[in-house]
Structures are given as structure tokens and as C-alpha cells.
Amino acid sequence: MSTENNLDLLFNNSVKILTDLIGFKTISGEDNTALINYCDDILKKLGATSFRTYDDEKKRVNLFATLKAKSSNNKKPIILSGHTDVVPVSKGWSSDPFTATIKDDKLYGRGSCDMKGFIACALAYAPIYSKSNLDRDIHFSFTFDEETACIGAPILIEELKRRNIKDGICIVGEPTNMKIIDAHKGCYEYTTHFKGLAGHSS
């Protein structure tokens, strides 16, 4: 198959998967199990192993799936990471936000950009990874409730620690206007102690 045909196939498969993903109404705080089942099914058919972690109510789910390297080595794995939840729908939509609509070569639907589009691309490429002579593991990490407080990711991270799954190169497919971003804002809290004499100058 030519490179051009491969690209066409990848594009069409990405659009098909994205169309399916948009159809899952995974608003933050709501059940995302059906979407996780869909993703897990695609990956397991390709030979991936997976496990899940949950919120306290067992209705919101993280998925962590792995396509193993063909040979044993110490190369760091690649982690393709994305969140499955979307923000609630506001007014102003001219089409059903949970039905993918293509207009003027653009695809519209809640979460199409942030960030079901990346998840669709990762899943569309998975068959290529599964047939390749991988020299490192490829992980797929799909989490819940990023939009509200990044609730799902810490639960998954604790399970990764418990299973002693080593860190690696993590690609988080958030929309960035096609720019590579190698850092993100965050916060850290410090408690400090000082010794000395109080003073003031003006």
C-alpha cells in the first residue's frame, strides 16, 4: 500500500473513531464507562493488555492499556495521554453537539478538539503500532474529569506506582495550535522558616 493510501486510511479511520467518541456524552462528573469500553475493545483486539481505575462511585473510569515491545530492553515507554471528559454544552450550537457534523472541511462536535480528537488519532494509529517491531512499550492513558479538577489522573498515577510501571515519554494531546509545549503551569506549596532581626526601610 502506498504512503498516500496509508495516510488516507489513517485520516478516514481517525474521523470515524472521532465521530464515535463524540457520540458518547461524557460531561465532567458523569459516567464515561461506555466510551472506555469502546477504547478498550479497540486496543484489546490488537493484543493490548489493560487495567482500569475508578472513582469512589465506580461510575467514572480511567483506562491504561499497553502494546508491549517486541523485545525486552530498557528503553523508556511512550505514553499517549488524553482525558475523556468534556465541559457542559452552552447555548449557541447550530447542530447537535454530541453528533459529529462536518461542514466546510471542519468537524464540529463537543470534545472534537479538547480532546477526543487526540484520542481518536492515538486509536487510529494503534493498528500500525501493533504490527510494528516496537522497541519500547506504547501506553494509552485515558482519564476522567480533567476539566473540573484533574480528578482522574492522580488516581491512575497511584496505581501506576503500585504496579511499578516505569515512567517514560508522555505525550499529552491537548490542543496547542500545532505548537510543541514542553512544560505546563502548576503550583507548589512551601513552608519556610527564617531566623534574624526584623527590619524596615523606606
Question: Can you describe what each PLM-predicted range is?
Answer:
Residues K44, F140, Y190-F194:
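A structural signal for short, well-ordered beta-strand segments
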Residues V87-K103, K166-D167, D182-H193:
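Acidic-glycine-rich active-site phosphate/pyrophosphate-binding loop
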Residues M115-E189:
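Acidic/histidine-rich catalytic neighborhood of metal-dependent amide-processing enzymes
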